[in-house]
Amino acid sequence: ATGNIGRSLEATLKARDARLVGIDPSDEMRKIYNAPGIFVCSPAESYDYEPFDLGISFLTLMFVEPSKRRDYLRRLLDKCRPGGAIIIFDKLETHHGYFGTVMTRLTLAGKYEAGVDAKEIIEKELSLAGVQRPITLGQLPGVPYQWFRFGDFAGYILEKPI
């Protein structure tokens, strides 16, 4: 919600005379939001969406209560115009068993090797306990098209039929 996506889409938004609405429930994020369009401080699942052609859900669903995810996405699809799409990028539940352990360790090692302080990594991981719950593929409605996968992170497209 800092505006990275909006900034990367700025030229396209201008060329297509499109409107961007950034949504996040955190007032802290509102304060650092820096992108074209407007910022709305609201939980994504309770926001009153207007009809749209393209929606982007970036690291959002893992913070939506699991029992509300499918209904939220169905409501988004209802607001999506025919031929439009919702792009989802989120964290998936980790693989089970040792493979899941390896992926988690590789993720933490990657953060550390990128220069993030070990204490900061641990503090962030602990702060997410009870707040972040990764998604499962079964929580996505319809037949999502997977366009990206790296470790526990995946990207999907939900298309609204014409």
Predicted features, each with a name:
Residues 1-47:
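Class I SAM-dependent methyltransferase SAM/SAH-binding core
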Residues 56-57:
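A conserved beta-strand element that flanks and buttresses the S-adenosyl-L-methionine
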Residues 83-91:
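Conserved beta-strand signature within the Rossmann-like core of class I S-adenosyl-L-methionine
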